[in-house]
C-alpha cells in the first residue's frame, strides 16, 4: 500500500456513546465495523493491508470487557505498528457513574455486566476491568455533559484532517405532488412564483434549461425571495457545521419538481459551491417525461 492504514479502535464504558462515535467516523469517510471481536483484529488488518486495497481509514468498535484481550492489545498494536504500514489510535469514551445510570434508566436497557439488574454494580465492575485500557488510550473523551451533537463535534475536531469534508450540503429540488423528501432539513416552497408549466414552449423543459431558468428568475418575487433566503442561509450554515452536523439537506419544492424548484436549487447551489462541499440533485425533474413515455 502506498499510504499507511489508519485504524481507530473505539472502546469505553457501556452507554458512553460508542454508537454516536462510530457514526461520526463513518461520516468522515472511515470504513467502520461495529462490535469487532478482539481476536479477529489481526486477521482483519491482514485482509486490508494488501497492495490492491483502497481503504486507508478504519474505525472499529471493540468490546474489551475480556481481560484476556488486555494482555494482548499492546503486543498486537506494537507488532502491527512496527511493520511500518499501520497507525493505531485508541479512543476511550467515558462518563461518570451518575450519568451512565441515568442513560440506562432512560433507555430501560440492562447493563451487560449488571448482576440481578443492579446497574451501578455493573458499571463499577466494568470501570475496574477497563481501567488499564483507559490509561493506554491516546484519546479519552468524557461524554457526561455532551449531547450526541456535541460528541460528534468533539470527535470531528480530534480526528478529522483539515482536508476532509466533515460538513456537506445537499441542495435538492422536488415536486410536492410526489411527496416531501423525508431527509430534508430545510424545505422552501416556491409555488408562489409564476409557473412555467403554463407557457407552452417551456412546459417540456426544466429549470436547468436557460429559457426556464431566466423565466423564473426574471420576476421581482424571485429576486426578493433569493436575496432574503441568502441573508438567512449564509450565517446559519457555519452554525450547522459547528454543531457537528455532517450533511445538511436544503430542499426546494414546487408543484411537479420540474421548473421553479429546479431553477432555485441551481441558483442557490451555484452561490454556495465555492465555499462549501456541495451536491445538487433534482428528484422529480424528469418524472413527468418518464410518465408520458410509459403511457
From Swiss-Prot:
Keywords tagged on the record: ATP-binding, GTP-binding, Nucleotide-binding
Function according to Swiss-Prot or TrEMBL: Displays ATPase and GTPase activities.
Protein name per Swiss-Prot or TrEMBL: Nucleotide-binding protein YjiE
UniProt cross-references to NCBIfam families, sorted A to Z: PRK05416.1 (NF003828)
Gene3D superfamilies: P-loop containing nucleotide triphosphate hydrolases
GO MF, any single term: ATP binding
Residues engaged in binding GTP: 63-66
Assigned protein family: Belongs to the RapZ-like family.
Sites where the protein binds ATP: 12-19
Top-level taxonomic group: Bacteria
